[in-house]
Amino acid sequence: LTFPRKGDTPRIREYAITGKLQRQFLNGNNSKIRADGFVTAGNVTGTATEEFITSFGQGVEPRVRVFNRAGVQLRSFLAFPSAYRGGVVHATGDVDGDGVEEIIVGTATGTAQVRVFSGTGKLIRQFFAFTKQYTGGIRLAIADVDGDGSNEILASKFSKDPRVAIFSGSGIFIR
């Protein structure tokens, strides 16, 4: 999966392992947006197939979109208040153990806010990954880092500081 760099049409592309283009579609209905962005695949609807989840970088409203494999938009929701234009990073993974992946979003710039949404776009929980004084943005990953069978939320600072904070799926700081 690829999302174009800033300045290009916001077209999502899926490639086979051989490098052959499988499908492509616009991220939303505005081909004039020229921001960078993020795309992941995850099963956030509980169906038999994964969906594509997208968000834009800086300069665009903080909207997350969920598309089916054919590029049809299934859901769309604001991850943060509409005035926030600092960019939205995201990851997907089952962090509550129900068998359906959640959409975990973070601020690409500004305070290190993390929000966990259901696949329908309902806010489940929110927390800060680092102190409110840190304003450099974060990157996210989901993994079972302690081998207990449950996924954790990993947040790293988008800075020279190599610190990674690990949280339970319920947002409790682990280390």
Predicted regions and their residues:
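Beta-propeller blade termini
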Residues: 1, 37-45, 50-54, 88-95, ...
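Extended intrinsically disordered, low-complexity coil regions enriched in Ser, Thr, Gly, Ala
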Residues: 15, 27, 68, 78, ...
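Short glycine/acidic-enriched loop and turn motifs that connect beta-strands
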Residues: 5-9, 57-61, 109-111, 158-161
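Repeat-based blade/solenoid architectures
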Residues: 24-41, 78-91, 128-141
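Short loop/turn segments that connect beta-strands within beta-propeller blades
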Residues: 16-20, 68-72, 118-122, 168-172
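A short loop-to-beta-strand structural motif that recurs across blades of beta-propeller domains
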Residues: 11-13, 63-65, 113-115, 163-165
